[in-house]
């Protein structure tokens, strides 16, 4: 049996959290997920986590601390630098895409509105997480 993926999901919309969890299950992805819904709680979690996540999936539009600020802090930490990051957000602005690319994210995905879109999103997340294991 394959080891479950350790995922950190930084997302403030409970409906999107549930959709992502359902899509992971529908695609038979074995995972353990920590969900953080407020940006200001991310570094408390990461600094006290016994096991770092294999992949971070995050929104850019978060309460209390902006997702871009979180992304910059993650990429500034040597212990977190190698963790792949998938940005999953409603934003599709060229500025956001450019910023995230410069921060070294693995994938930028605009939140889908269809089941097929969510299945494609799951495929992307699993591919990024799998490649980090190799």
Label every PLM stretch briefly.
Residues 37, 62-65, 74:
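Hydrophobic residue at a beta-alpha junction
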Residues 63, 81, 93:
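The feature encodes the CheY-like receiver
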Residues 35-55, 119:
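Acidic, metal-coordinating helix/loop segments flanking the phosphotransfer/catalytic sites
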Residues 11:
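Conserved acidic carboxylate
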Residues 113-124:
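C-terminal output helix
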Residues 58-59, 89:
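Active-site residues of response regulator receiver
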Residues 14-39:
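Two-component/phosphorelay signaling modules centered on CheY-like receiver
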